[in-house]
């Protein structure tokens, strides 16, 4: 489990990215890089990190499920993810 402060920080970044999305897009289209530079750093989508929705783990996260490989395996074995089952061949 990730630290709660790290998870909260990432959520704060997500809010900032959503808040400044339109403004950033307009400034980029105009080519006003000076104004872009004055915006908060955390409003840039590049600074976002995908984190597991269950554990907050930053590494090994599947985009399709939004979960880390470890949490995905646990949930899949319990049958809590529809359409996912253990394969064998």
UniProtKB/Swiss-Prot annotation:
Transmembrane segments: none annotated. PROSITE patterns: RIBOSOMAL_S14. It comes from Staphylococcus saprophyticus subsp. saprophyticus (strain ATCC 15305 / DSM 20229 / NCIMB 8711 / NCTC 7292 / S-41). GO terms for biological process: translation. The keyword Ribosomal protein applies. The keyword Transport does not apply. Belongs to the universal ribosomal protein uS14 family. This is Small ribosomal subunit protein uS14A. Part of the 30S ribosomal subunit. Contacts proteins S3 and S10. Binds 16S rRNA, required for the assembly of 30S particles and may also be responsible for determining the conformation of the 16S rRNA at the A site. One of its GO terms (molecular function) is structural constituent of ribosome. InterPro entries: Ribosomal_uS14, Ribosomal_uS14_bac/plastid, Ribosomal_uS14_CS, Ribosomal_uS14_sf. Keywords: Ribonucleoprotein, Ribosomal protein, RNA-binding, rRNA-binding. GO terms for cellular component: cytoplasm; small ribosomal subunit. Disulfide bonds: none annotated.
């Amino acid at each position: 489990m990730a630290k709660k402060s790290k998870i909260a920080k990432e959520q704060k970044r997500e809010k900032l990215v959503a808040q400044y999305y339109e403004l950033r897009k307009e400034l980029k289209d105009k080519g006003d890089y000076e104004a872009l530079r004055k915006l908060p750093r955390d409003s840039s989508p590049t600074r976002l990190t995908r984190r597991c929705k269950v554990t907050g783990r930053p590494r090994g996260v599947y985009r399709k499920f939004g979960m880390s490989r470890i949490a995905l395996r646990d949930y899949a074995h319990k049958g809590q993810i529809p359409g996912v089952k253990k394969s064998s061949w």
